Amino acid sequence: MERQYASIETIASLIQNSDKAIEELYIALKQDFAIRNALDESMPHLYSVTHDILTGIWFILMDIGVSCRALFQTNYAYEKRFHLKNVLASISEGFKAIMNFGKSRKYALWNLLEEELIQIDNADLIDSFNKIKLQLIEFGDNRIDKDIRDLTLHYDDAMIKVFEKTASLNSEEDTMKLLCEFWAILQDMLKFTYTLDEYTQANTGLTKPNEAINVQFDVNHDHNVIKLLIDNKGKLEAAISTVLPKATNQLDDMANHYFRLQKIRKYIKEEAPFNIEFPELNNLEILANHDLLIRFMVLDLASVINAYLHSDSDIEASLNLRRVVVIKTSTLVHLYGYDDREQEKSVWKSIQSFIPSDDETLKAEEQAIQDLLSKLVAESDDKRLRASLVHLYDNGRHKSNTEETLEGVEILDPARQTVEILLLMEINKRMEAFTKKLMDTLAQNARLQKEASQREMLDKITFMRQRIEQSNASPDIKDTFRQMMNKIQNIILL
Protein backbone atom coordinates (compact mmCIF):
# COMPACT_ATOMS: atom_id res chain seq x y z
CA MET A 1 0.00 0.00 0.00
CA GLU A 2 1.33 3.44 -0.93
CA ARG A 3 2.37 5.53 2.03
CA GLN A 4 0.17 8.57 2.76
CA TYR A 5 2.14 11.69 3.63
CA ALA A 6 0.80 14.77 5.34
CA SER A 7 -0.32 17.24 2.69
CA ILE A 8 1.65 20.39 1.98
CA GLU A 9 -1.35 22.41 3.15
CA THR A 10 -1.38 20.52 6.46
CA ILE A 11 2.32 21.08 7.00
CA ALA A 12 1.99 24.77 6.07
CA SER A 13 -0.89 25.18 8.52
CA LEU A 14 1.09 23.50 11.28
CA ILE A 15 4.09 25.72 10.61
CA GLN A 16 2.07 28.93 10.49
CA ASN A 17 0.78 28.11 13.96
CA SER A 18 3.99 26.60 15.26
CA ASP A 19 5.15 29.48 17.45
CA LYS A 20 3.67 27.75 20.51
CA ALA A 21 4.87 24.34 19.29
CA ILE A 22 8.46 25.65 19.17
CA GLU A 23 8.22 26.72 22.81
CA GLU A 24 6.56 23.43 23.78
CA LEU A 25 9.34 21.45 22.10
CA TYR A 26 11.92 23.54 23.95
CA ILE A 27 10.19 22.85 27.27
CA ALA A 28 9.98 19.12 26.47
CA LEU A 29 13.70 19.04 25.64
CA LYS A 30 14.67 20.77 28.88
CA GLN A 31 12.43 18.50 30.95
CA ASP A 32 13.84 15.36 29.34
CA PHE A 33 17.43 16.45 29.91
CA ALA A 34 16.61 17.33 33.54
CA ILE A 35 15.07 13.89 34.18
CA ARG A 36 18.00 12.06 32.62
CA ASN A 37 20.50 14.10 34.60
CA ALA A 38 18.57 13.24 37.78
CA LEU A 39 18.72 9.49 37.13
CA ASP A 40 21.65 7.59 38.61
CA GLU A 41 24.31 5.71 36.66
CA SER A 42 22.16 2.56 36.64
CA MET A 43 20.00 4.11 33.90
CA PRO A 44 19.59 1.41 31.21
CA HIS A 45 21.51 2.08 28.01
CA LEU A 46 18.33 1.31 26.06
CA TYR A 47 16.63 4.24 27.80
CA SER A 48 19.62 6.52 27.12
CA VAL A 49 19.80 5.73 23.39
CA THR A 50 16.01 5.94 23.00
CA HIS A 51 15.97 9.41 24.53
CA ASP A 52 18.98 10.54 22.50
CA ILE A 53 16.84 9.79 19.44
CA LEU A 54 13.71 11.32 20.96
CA THR A 55 15.40 14.61 21.92
CA GLY A 56 17.16 14.68 18.55
CA ILE A 57 13.79 14.50 16.78
CA TRP A 58 12.34 17.23 18.99
CA PHE A 59 15.27 19.52 18.21
CA ILE A 60 15.00 18.77 14.47
CA LEU A 61 11.28 19.65 14.49
CA MET A 62 11.97 22.83 16.46
CA ASP A 63 14.80 23.87 14.13
CA ILE A 64 12.87 23.19 10.92
CA GLY A 65 9.82 24.94 12.38
CA VAL A 66 11.84 28.12 12.96
CA SER A 67 13.14 28.18 9.36
CA CYS A 68 9.70 27.42 7.93
CA ARG A 69 8.05 30.19 9.93
CA ALA A 70 10.61 32.64 8.56
CA LEU A 71 10.08 31.25 5.05
CA PHE A 72 6.33 31.87 5.10
CA GLN A 73 6.69 35.37 6.59
CA THR A 74 8.61 36.88 3.68
CA ASN A 75 7.89 37.65 0.04
CA TYR A 76 11.46 38.45 -1.04
CA ALA A 77 12.86 35.88 -3.48
CA TYR A 78 16.36 35.74 -2.02
CA GLU A 79 15.13 35.58 1.55
CA LYS A 80 12.86 32.67 0.63
CA ARG A 81 15.80 30.85 -0.96
CA PHE A 82 17.89 31.47 2.15
CA HIS A 83 15.27 29.87 4.40
CA LEU A 84 14.65 27.05 1.91
CA LYS A 85 18.38 26.28 2.08
CA ASN A 86 18.22 26.21 5.86
CA VAL A 87 15.19 23.89 5.85
CA LEU A 88 17.11 21.51 3.59
CA ALA A 89 20.28 21.86 5.68
CA SER A 90 18.29 21.13 8.86
CA ILE A 91 16.79 18.02 7.26
CA SER A 92 20.28 16.85 6.29
CA GLU A 93 21.83 17.67 9.68
CA GLY A 94 18.87 16.06 11.45
CA PHE A 95 19.17 12.91 9.37
CA LYS A 96 22.90 12.85 10.09
CA ALA A 97 22.18 12.97 13.84
CA ILE A 98 19.92 9.91 13.64
CA MET A 99 21.17 7.74 10.75
CA ASN A 100 24.33 9.45 9.44
CA PHE A 101 26.02 8.86 6.09
CA GLY A 102 28.65 6.55 4.63
CA LYS A 103 31.05 4.81 7.00
CA SER A 104 29.79 6.86 9.96
CA ARG A 105 26.38 5.16 9.65
CA LYS A 106 27.80 2.20 11.60
CA TYR A 107 27.78 4.35 14.75
CA ALA A 108 24.49 6.16 14.08
CA LEU A 109 22.02 6.43 16.96
CA TRP A 110 19.49 4.31 15.09
CA ASN A 111 22.04 1.52 14.65
CA LEU A 112 23.15 1.79 18.28
CA LEU A 113 19.50 1.29 19.18
CA GLU A 114 19.44 -1.84 17.02
CA GLU A 115 22.18 -3.37 19.18
CA GLU A 116 20.00 -2.84 22.26
CA LEU A 117 16.93 -4.35 20.57
CA ILE A 118 18.86 -7.47 19.56
CA GLN A 119 19.72 -8.04 23.21
CA ILE A 120 16.11 -7.85 24.43
CA ASP A 121 14.95 -10.06 21.52
CA ASN A 122 11.43 -8.66 21.09
CA ALA A 123 10.18 -9.63 17.62
CA ASP A 124 7.48 -6.95 17.39
CA LEU A 125 9.88 -4.17 18.36
CA ILE A 126 12.57 -5.41 15.97
CA ASP A 127 10.05 -5.65 13.12
CA SER A 128 8.83 -2.07 13.69
CA PHE A 129 12.42 -0.89 14.00
CA ASN A 130 13.49 -2.50 10.71
CA LYS A 131 10.58 -0.95 8.79
CA ILE A 132 11.65 2.52 9.91
CA LYS A 133 15.31 1.72 9.21
CA LEU A 134 14.47 0.89 5.59
CA GLN A 135 12.59 4.20 5.24
CA LEU A 136 15.57 6.08 6.68
CA ILE A 137 18.09 4.41 4.38
CA GLU A 138 15.97 5.06 1.28
CA PHE A 139 15.39 8.68 2.27
CA GLY A 140 19.04 9.37 3.13
CA ASP A 141 20.47 7.67 0.04
CA ASN A 142 18.03 9.07 -2.51
CA ARG A 143 16.38 12.24 -1.23
CA ILE A 144 18.97 14.27 0.67
CA ASP A 145 21.21 16.75 -1.14
CA LYS A 146 24.31 16.87 1.06
CA ASP A 147 25.89 19.50 -1.20
CA ILE A 148 23.26 22.06 -0.31
CA ARG A 149 23.83 21.37 3.39
CA ASP A 150 27.59 21.95 2.97
CA LEU A 151 27.17 25.08 0.83
CA THR A 152 24.61 26.50 3.28
CA LEU A 153 26.61 25.88 6.44
CA HIS A 154 30.15 26.35 5.06
CA TYR A 155 29.98 28.32 1.78
CA ASP A 156 32.73 27.29 -0.67
CA ASP A 157 36.11 28.35 -2.04
CA ALA A 158 34.29 28.90 -5.35
CA MET A 159 31.31 31.06 -4.41
CA ILE A 160 29.79 30.68 -7.87
CA LYS A 161 28.82 27.15 -6.73
CA VAL A 162 26.86 28.68 -3.86
CA PHE A 163 25.20 31.07 -6.30
CA GLU A 164 24.21 28.31 -8.73
CA LYS A 165 22.84 26.06 -5.99
CA THR A 166 20.93 28.95 -4.39
CA ALA A 167 19.51 30.08 -7.73
CA SER A 168 18.27 26.54 -8.40
CA LEU A 169 15.88 26.72 -5.42
CA ASN A 170 12.78 28.07 -7.12
CA SER A 171 10.12 25.77 -5.70
CA GLU A 172 8.74 25.97 -2.19
CA GLU A 173 6.51 23.06 -3.17
CA ASP A 174 9.45 20.72 -3.86
CA THR A 175 11.04 21.54 -0.51
CA MET A 176 7.73 21.11 1.30
CA LYS A 177 7.21 17.73 -0.39
CA LEU A 178 10.60 16.61 0.87
CA LEU A 179 9.75 17.94 4.31
CA CYS A 180 6.47 16.02 4.27
CA GLU A 181 8.35 12.79 3.57
CA PHE A 182 10.83 13.46 6.37
CA TRP A 183 8.05 14.59 8.70
CA ALA A 184 6.21 11.28 8.15
CA ILE A 185 9.33 9.26 9.01
CA LEU A 186 9.93 11.37 12.13
CA GLN A 187 6.34 10.76 13.26
CA ASP A 188 6.84 7.00 12.91
CA MET A 189 10.07 7.29 14.88
CA LEU A 190 8.37 9.30 17.62
CA LYS A 191 5.67 6.67 18.02
CA PHE A 192 8.32 3.97 18.16
CA THR A 193 10.43 5.78 20.78
CA TYR A 194 7.31 6.35 22.95
CA THR A 195 6.59 2.61 22.74
CA LEU A 196 10.19 1.82 23.63
CA ASP A 197 10.08 4.23 26.55
CA GLU A 198 7.03 2.44 27.96
CA TYR A 199 8.70 -0.95 27.39
CA THR A 200 11.88 0.17 29.16
CA GLN A 201 10.03 1.41 32.23
CA ALA A 202 7.91 -1.74 32.40
CA ASN A 203 10.73 -4.26 31.89
CA THR A 204 13.96 -2.83 33.29
CA GLY A 205 12.90 -1.58 36.69
CA LEU A 206 13.66 2.00 35.71
CA THR A 207 11.86 4.47 37.92
CA LYS A 208 11.78 8.09 36.90
CA PRO A 209 12.09 10.62 39.74
CA ASN A 210 8.70 11.25 41.34
CA GLU A 211 9.63 14.53 42.95
CA ALA A 212 9.26 17.71 40.95
CA ILE A 213 12.27 18.14 38.69
CA ASN A 214 13.88 21.55 38.77
CA VAL A 215 14.01 22.57 35.12
CA GLN A 216 16.18 25.57 34.30
CA PHE A 217 15.09 27.44 31.19
CA ASP A 218 18.33 29.23 30.46
CA VAL A 219 17.55 30.88 27.14
CA ASN A 220 18.62 34.52 27.09
CA HIS A 221 15.66 36.80 27.85
CA ASP A 222 17.12 40.02 26.41
CA HIS A 223 15.90 39.40 22.87
CA ASN A 224 12.79 41.60 23.01
CA VAL A 225 14.80 44.54 24.35
CA ILE A 226 17.51 44.09 21.71
CA LYS A 227 14.93 43.76 18.92
CA LEU A 228 13.27 47.02 19.95
CA LEU A 229 16.62 48.80 20.12
CA ILE A 230 17.98 47.64 16.77
CA ASP A 231 14.70 47.97 14.89
CA ASN A 232 14.37 51.60 16.05
CA LYS A 233 10.60 51.91 15.52
CA GLY A 234 10.59 49.91 12.30
CA LYS A 235 13.50 51.70 10.62
CA LEU A 236 15.68 48.58 10.42
CA GLU A 237 12.88 46.46 8.97
CA ALA A 238 12.21 49.17 6.38
CA ALA A 239 15.92 49.34 5.54
CA ILE A 240 16.04 45.57 5.05
CA SER A 241 13.09 45.76 2.66
CA THR A 242 15.19 48.18 0.57
CA VAL A 243 18.49 46.34 0.90
CA LEU A 244 17.28 42.85 -0.04
CA PRO A 245 16.10 43.53 -3.63
CA LYS A 246 19.00 45.91 -4.34
CA ALA A 247 21.63 43.52 -2.97
CA THR A 248 20.03 40.60 -4.83
CA ASN A 249 20.38 42.49 -8.13
CA GLN A 250 24.01 43.28 -7.30
CA LEU A 251 24.64 39.60 -6.55
CA ASP A 252 23.11 38.59 -9.89
CA ASP A 253 25.19 41.22 -11.71
CA MET A 254 28.41 40.00 -10.11
CA ALA A 255 27.57 36.36 -10.90
CA ASN A 256 26.95 37.33 -14.54
CA HIS A 257 30.27 39.19 -14.55
CA TYR A 258 31.98 36.03 -13.25
CA PHE A 259 30.29 33.92 -15.94
CA ARG A 260 31.51 36.36 -18.62
CA LEU A 261 35.07 36.07 -17.33
CA GLN A 262 34.79 32.28 -17.53
CA LYS A 263 33.51 32.50 -21.12
CA ILE A 264 36.43 34.73 -22.09
CA ARG A 265 38.88 32.28 -20.52
CA LYS A 266 37.23 29.36 -22.33
CA TYR A 267 37.24 31.21 -25.67
CA ILE A 268 40.91 32.10 -25.39
CA LYS A 269 41.82 28.52 -24.46
CA GLU A 270 39.84 26.98 -27.33
CA GLU A 271 40.30 29.53 -30.11
CA ALA A 272 43.77 31.00 -29.71
CA PRO A 273 46.28 29.35 -32.09
CA PHE A 274 48.97 29.68 -29.40
CA ASN A 275 49.07 29.95 -25.62
CA ILE A 276 48.10 33.42 -24.39
CA GLU A 277 48.44 34.28 -20.69
CA PHE A 278 46.24 36.97 -19.13
CA PRO A 279 47.10 37.15 -15.39
CA GLU A 280 44.71 40.09 -15.08
CA LEU A 281 41.83 37.78 -16.00
CA ASN A 282 42.70 35.52 -13.07
CA ASN A 283 42.89 38.56 -10.78
CA LEU A 284 39.44 39.73 -11.88
CA GLU A 285 38.01 36.24 -11.24
CA ILE A 286 39.46 36.27 -7.70
CA LEU A 287 37.95 39.69 -7.05
CA ALA A 288 34.58 38.57 -8.44
CA ASN A 289 34.68 35.50 -6.18
CA HIS A 290 35.49 37.75 -3.22
CA ASP A 291 32.64 40.08 -4.14
CA LEU A 292 30.20 37.14 -4.31
CA LEU A 293 31.32 35.99 -0.85
CA ILE A 294 30.74 39.42 0.69
CA ARG A 295 27.37 39.89 -1.02
CA PHE A 296 26.17 36.48 0.17
CA MET A 297 27.20 37.47 3.69
CA VAL A 298 25.19 40.70 3.51
CA LEU A 299 22.09 39.03 2.05
CA ASP A 300 22.22 36.14 4.50
CA LEU A 301 22.66 38.47 7.47
CA ALA A 302 19.74 40.62 6.29
CA SER A 303 17.59 37.48 6.01
CA VAL A 304 18.60 36.36 9.51
CA ILE A 305 17.94 39.78 11.05
CA ASN A 306 14.50 39.94 9.45
CA ALA A 307 13.63 36.49 10.81
CA TYR A 308 15.01 37.51 14.21
CA LEU A 309 12.85 40.64 14.33
CA HIS A 310 9.75 38.50 13.64
CA SER A 311 10.54 35.82 16.23
CA ASP A 312 7.69 35.27 18.70
CA SER A 313 9.67 33.71 21.57
CA ASP A 314 13.13 33.85 23.10
CA ILE A 315 14.01 30.34 21.93
CA GLU A 316 12.88 31.08 18.36
CA ALA A 317 14.93 34.29 18.45
CA SER A 318 18.02 32.41 19.66
CA LEU A 319 17.62 29.70 17.02
CA ASN A 320 17.46 32.40 14.34
CA LEU A 321 20.35 34.35 15.81
CA ARG A 322 22.67 31.34 15.78
CA ARG A 323 22.72 31.70 12.00
CA VAL A 324 24.77 34.88 12.52
CA VAL A 325 27.58 32.74 13.97
CA VAL A 326 27.32 30.30 11.05
CA ILE A 327 27.38 33.11 8.44
CA LYS A 328 30.23 34.97 10.12
CA THR A 329 32.38 31.85 10.48
CA SER A 330 31.67 30.62 6.95
CA THR A 331 32.58 34.03 5.54
CA LEU A 332 35.79 34.50 7.54
CA VAL A 333 37.07 30.96 6.87
CA HIS A 334 37.16 31.74 3.14
CA LEU A 335 37.77 35.48 3.29
CA TYR A 336 40.62 35.65 5.83
CA GLY A 337 41.06 32.38 7.76
CA TYR A 338 41.24 31.50 11.44
CA ASP A 339 44.62 29.71 11.30
CA ASP A 340 47.77 29.71 9.18
CA ARG A 341 46.49 27.05 6.78
CA GLU A 342 43.22 28.88 6.08
CA GLN A 343 44.94 32.25 5.83
CA GLU A 344 47.45 30.94 3.30
CA LYS A 345 44.66 29.85 0.91
CA SER A 346 42.25 32.70 1.73
CA VAL A 347 40.69 35.10 -0.75
CA TRP A 348 42.30 37.99 1.10
CA LYS A 349 45.79 36.51 0.66
CA SER A 350 45.18 36.25 -3.08
CA ILE A 351 43.92 39.82 -3.29
CA GLN A 352 46.93 41.18 -1.42
CA SER A 353 49.25 39.62 -3.98
CA PHE A 354 48.05 41.77 -6.87
CA ILE A 355 47.55 45.17 -5.23
CA PRO A 356 49.78 47.56 -7.24
CA SER A 357 52.87 48.31 -5.13
CA ASP A 358 52.85 51.98 -6.14
CA ASP A 359 49.21 52.66 -5.16
CA GLU A 360 49.55 54.07 -1.64
CA THR A 361 45.81 54.72 -1.25
CA LEU A 362 44.93 51.09 -1.94
CA LYS A 363 47.75 49.80 0.26
CA ALA A 364 46.63 51.99 3.18
CA GLU A 365 43.03 50.79 2.87
CA GLU A 366 44.22 47.19 2.55
CA GLN A 367 46.10 47.55 5.85
CA ALA A 368 43.06 49.07 7.59
CA ILE A 369 40.84 46.17 6.45
CA GLN A 370 43.58 43.68 7.39
CA ASP A 371 43.63 45.10 10.93
CA LEU A 372 39.84 44.78 11.21
CA LEU A 373 39.83 41.19 9.99
CA SER A 374 42.73 40.22 12.22
CA LYS A 375 41.01 41.68 15.27
CA LEU A 376 37.71 39.99 14.42
CA VAL A 377 39.39 36.58 14.16
CA ALA A 378 41.76 36.96 17.12
CA GLU A 379 39.03 37.91 19.60
CA SER A 380 36.60 35.16 18.63
CA ASP A 381 35.83 31.56 19.45
CA ASP A 382 33.77 31.28 16.29
CA LYS A 383 34.73 27.85 15.00
CA ARG A 384 34.16 26.02 18.27
CA LEU A 385 30.93 27.96 18.87
CA ARG A 386 29.70 27.29 15.34
CA ALA A 387 30.34 23.55 15.69
CA SER A 388 28.45 23.48 19.01
CA LEU A 389 25.47 25.28 17.44
CA VAL A 390 25.18 23.10 14.32
CA HIS A 391 26.19 19.50 14.94
CA LEU A 392 23.59 17.36 16.73
CA TYR A 393 25.84 14.29 16.67
CA ASP A 394 29.51 13.97 17.60
CA ASN A 395 31.13 11.67 15.02
CA GLY A 396 34.34 11.52 17.02
CA ARG A 397 32.76 10.33 20.26
CA HIS A 398 29.82 8.49 18.64
CA LYS A 399 27.24 10.21 20.81
CA SER A 400 24.36 12.66 20.67
CA ASN A 401 25.28 16.33 20.90
CA THR A 402 21.72 17.68 21.18
CA GLU A 403 21.94 18.83 24.80
CA GLU A 404 25.20 20.71 24.15
CA THR A 405 23.74 22.28 21.00
CA LEU A 406 20.67 23.50 22.89
CA GLU A 407 22.87 24.93 25.65
CA GLY A 408 24.88 26.80 23.00
CA VAL A 409 21.67 28.24 21.53
CA GLU A 410 20.44 29.28 24.99
CA ILE A 411 23.52 31.23 25.99
CA LEU A 412 23.81 33.23 22.77
CA ASP A 413 24.11 36.88 23.76
CA PRO A 414 21.94 39.02 21.43
CA ALA A 415 23.85 42.18 22.36
CA ARG A 416 27.18 40.61 21.38
CA GLN A 417 25.77 39.16 18.17
CA THR A 418 24.39 42.60 17.29
CA VAL A 419 27.89 44.06 17.71
CA GLU A 420 29.25 41.25 15.51
CA ILE A 421 26.73 42.14 12.80
CA LEU A 422 27.73 45.81 12.97
CA LEU A 423 31.42 44.86 12.64
CA LEU A 424 30.66 42.66 9.64
CA MET A 425 28.66 45.47 8.04
CA GLU A 426 31.57 47.88 8.60
CA ILE A 427 33.93 45.42 6.94
CA ASN A 428 31.48 45.00 4.06
CA LYS A 429 31.26 48.77 3.58
CA ARG A 430 35.04 49.14 3.42
CA MET A 431 35.46 46.00 1.32
CA GLU A 432 32.92 47.20 -1.23
CA ALA A 433 34.72 50.51 -1.75
CA PHE A 434 38.14 48.83 -1.72
CA THR A 435 37.32 46.09 -4.24
CA LYS A 436 35.60 48.56 -6.58
CA LYS A 437 38.69 50.77 -6.65
CA LEU A 438 40.97 47.74 -7.00
CA MET A 439 38.90 46.31 -9.86
CA ASP A 440 38.91 49.68 -11.62
CA THR A 441 42.68 49.95 -11.14
CA LEU A 442 43.31 46.43 -12.40
CA ALA A 443 41.00 46.96 -15.35
CA GLN A 444 42.81 50.20 -16.24
CA ASN A 445 46.21 48.52 -15.91
CA ALA A 446 44.95 45.61 -17.98
CA ARG A 447 43.76 48.00 -20.68
CA LEU A 448 47.12 49.76 -20.76
CA GLN A 449 49.01 46.46 -20.85
CA LYS A 450 46.66 45.09 -23.47
CA GLU A 451 47.08 48.17 -25.64
CA ALA A 452 50.87 47.98 -25.31
CA SER A 453 50.83 44.25 -26.03
CA GLN A 454 48.47 44.76 -28.97
CA ARG A 455 50.72 47.41 -30.46
CA GLU A 456 53.75 45.16 -30.10
CA MET A 457 52.00 42.13 -31.59
CA LEU A 458 50.34 44.12 -34.38
CA ASP A 459 53.73 45.58 -35.30
CA LYS A 460 55.08 42.03 -35.56
CA ILE A 461 52.12 40.98 -37.71
CA THR A 462 52.65 44.00 -39.98
CA PHE A 463 56.31 43.11 -40.30
CA MET A 464 55.47 39.47 -41.10
CA ARG A 465 52.85 40.55 -43.68
CA GLN A 466 55.42 42.74 -45.41
CA ARG A 467 57.97 39.93 -45.47
CA ILE A 468 55.56 37.38 -46.97
CA GLU A 469 54.26 39.87 -49.54
CA GLN A 470 57.83 40.65 -50.60
CA SER A 471 58.75 36.98 -50.76
CA ASN A 472 58.63 34.61 -53.73
CA ALA A 473 55.96 32.43 -52.10
CA SER A 474 53.13 31.18 -54.32
CA PRO A 475 49.80 33.06 -54.34
CA ASP A 476 48.14 30.14 -52.50
CA ILE A 477 50.68 30.23 -49.67
CA LYS A 478 50.39 34.00 -49.44
CA ASP A 479 46.58 33.76 -49.28
CA THR A 480 46.74 31.08 -46.56
CA PHE A 481 49.19 33.22 -44.59
CA ARG A 482 46.94 36.30 -44.91
CA GLN A 483 43.96 34.33 -43.55
CA MET A 484 46.01 33.06 -40.60
CA MET A 485 47.31 36.55 -39.81
CA ASN A 486 43.76 37.96 -40.01
CA LYS A 487 42.55 35.37 -37.50
CA ILE A 488 45.42 36.10 -35.10
CA GLN A 489 44.80 39.83 -35.45
CA ASN A 490 41.09 39.41 -34.68
CA ILE A 491 41.93 37.49 -31.49
CA ILE A 492 44.45 40.12 -30.42
CA LEU A 493 41.87 42.88 -30.93
CA LEU A 494 39.19 41.16 -28.81
What are the roles of these predicted feature ranges?
Residues 1-144, 159-380, 396-494:
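Amphipathic alpha-helical interface segments
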Residues 147-150, 154, 384-391:
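Long, charged low-complexity segments
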